[in-house]
Amino acid sequence: ELEHLACPEFINHADCVNCLNANRDVIAGVKVLLSAALADDGRNEAKAFREALQAAVTTATPLMTHHAQSTISIDECPGSMRAGDIYTHCYHGFESTIIDPQSRRVHPAVRAARTRGVLFDIGHGMGAFNWTVGEICAEEGFWPDIISTDLHTGCFEGPAYDMPTVMTRMLHLG
């Protein structure tokens, strides 16, 4: 299996912009998957994030980031994101979680991003929902703007199952 961002030559701003502009009827924005394991041990993550953000700016579309087990700091992502951009899998419990490891509170850069208008999405999926993160966020009133399943073949038999299951988890949090 090829890592998503293993080869830097696959990260191409111009091709992304051209593809998006040619398919505006079906493409709503740009998504970048930031995970060290899928980016040559993180070596290509910074370039991928920069190029994706620039492509979104160039095309005046939102950027969606998957930022889990990433070498990109929480200060940079969602710190560099714009109003209307989407930070998905916001309740994951992996490295680069939105919870500051020292204070065990929502990271100040995350709060600043929300104030700027960055949207936060559950994106439950296979392993992107962590009860401890959810409980901390609930205690602090940091609720997602979007509740989505991120349903795919790896999680329709659990843990996400379907939208009612994801919604029930959110209701359980408060």
Predicted regions and their residues:
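Generic anion/oxyanion-binding catalytic loop in active/binding sites
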Residues: 5, 76, 169
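Active-site mouth loops of central-metabolism enzymes
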Residues: 2-14
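Histidine/acidic residue-rich metal-binding segments in metalloenzymes
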Residues: 11-120, 128-145
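His/Asp/Glu-enriched, well-ordered alpha-helical/loop segment
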Residues: 130-174
